[in-house]
């Protein structure tokens, strides 16, 4: 049987391999099936294959597609984590693994740029990220507005603002990372079906049964990393989830373009009184990328997402550029939409299905999950194999009473 997913162009769909699924229906039993091959799913697929498990991954589109939450050319990794200090050890280990993955990848996966966080007086983001950094003894450099403007002249912020720089931050290339994990997992013996949607997951006495287009696959365990499609597959999740439409834009700098290049501009978060933004330097001619991190317009479901960015969406991002990065407020290069799958408290959801512990659920990363993919892959592989995870995940439970305190408000 042929492995799929080797060196896939970012926008090339792969047809489902019907001969493979036909064989599965007749004779194949898997140790684990992974549903959804985005950030967490691709890393889990790789990790299980590395361990020698009989693993199958099923992706309804293709690895690196633009219809979910694992695309957009770049993702931030930052260690000074305002969301909660408990993420920092996970991030430190994830970063080490991203560096290792980059060394073995034909495509660039990770670039160190440092990360800078900037905010208005009293911004919760600044206070909590500093607290997390100090607790975990991260290298961090605090700055007043004058130093921010001098060191990173792309920013023109008010005199009473403050910020800090953390040198270990950087940008990840999501499509390349997903392809790398899929490629490596397939080379280790993992199987992949693309262009095929899982219709049902059924619990049986001796196995879990999946239906795909009228055919059935049996497995000892399932990992559902389906992002915004999670509740379509596992309906008894008690934690309410909200899917939101998010828009990102790429811009050609108006003046002094070298100030916006990777090496001059780090990846950044900026907390303004009326919004919170994130962005990336110009890397390989992509332009300055920026977006709001505040959850956007709710969607009725995952299939409601369209690549339909509007002039109004552009205006929202230009508000950042006009006020705080005026030299970057040049011609629009392109815009793109994606989805956040949000929990009420802004933290992840990692747990077992209430009705069947053989079904592991991991999704709802609330817009900040991609950077954790290498660690999520190990955690989910452990859970799928009925092992105790190497990293603690109790704070990400579907039980609201066990979860971490809510992520601090950004505005």
PLM features: what roles do these ranges have?
Residues 167-220:
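Helical element adjacent to the flavin cofactor pocket in flavoenzyme catalytic cores
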Residues 89, 117-124, 165-183, 308-313:
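Short beta-strand to alpha-helix junction loop
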């Amino acid at each position: 049987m042929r492995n799929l997913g080797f060196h896939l162009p970012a926008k090339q769909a792969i047809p489902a391999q019907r001969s493979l699924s036909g064989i599965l229906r007749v004779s194949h039993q898997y140790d684990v099936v992974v549903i959804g091959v985005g950030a967490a799913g691709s890393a889990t697929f790789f990790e299980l294959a590395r361990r020698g498990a009989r693993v199958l991954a099923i992706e309804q589109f293709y690895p690196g597609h633009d219809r979910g939450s694992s695309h957009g050319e770049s993702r931030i990794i930052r260690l000074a984590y305002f969301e909660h200090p408990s993420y920092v050890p996970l991030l430190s280990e994830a970063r080490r693994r991203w560096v290792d993955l980059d060394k073995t990848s034909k495509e660039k996966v990770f670039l160190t740029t440092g990360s800078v966080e900037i905010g208005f007086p009293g911004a919760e983001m600044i206070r909590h990220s500093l607290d997390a950094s100090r607790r975990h003894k991260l290298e961090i450099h605090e700055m007043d507005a004058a130093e921010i403007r001098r060191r990173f002249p792309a920013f023109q912020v008010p005199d009473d603002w403050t910020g800090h720089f953390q040198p270990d931050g950087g940008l990840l290339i999501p499509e390349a990372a997903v392809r790398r994990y899929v490629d490596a997992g397939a080379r280790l013996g993992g199987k992949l079906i693309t262009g095929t949607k899982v219709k049902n997951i059924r619990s049986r006495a001796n196995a879990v049964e999946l239906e795909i287009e009228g055919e059935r696959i049996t497995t000892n365990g399932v990992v559902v990393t389906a992002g915004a499609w999670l509740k379509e597959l596992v309906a008894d999740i008690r934690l309410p989830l909200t899917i939101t439409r998010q828009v990102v834009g790429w811009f050609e700098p108006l003046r002094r373009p070298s100030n916006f290049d990777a090496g001059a501009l780090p990846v950044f978060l900026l907390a303004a009184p009326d919004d919170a933004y994130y962005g990336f330097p110009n890397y390989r001619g992509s332009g300055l990328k920026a977006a709001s991190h505040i959850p956007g317009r709710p969607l009725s479901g995952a299939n409601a997402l369209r690549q339909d960015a509007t002039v109004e969406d552009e205006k929202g991002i230009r508000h950042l550029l006009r006020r705080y990065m005026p030299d970057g407020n040049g011609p629009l290069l392109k815009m793109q939409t994606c989805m956040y799958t949000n929990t009420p408290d802004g933290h992840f959801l990692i747990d077992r299905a209430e009705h069947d512990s053989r079904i592991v659920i991991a999704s709802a990363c609330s817009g900040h999950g991609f950077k954790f993919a290498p660690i999520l892959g190990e955690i989910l592989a452990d859970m799928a194999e009925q092992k105790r995870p190497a990293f603690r995940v109790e704070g990400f439970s579907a039980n609201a009473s066990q979860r971490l305190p809510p992520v601090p408000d950004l505005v």
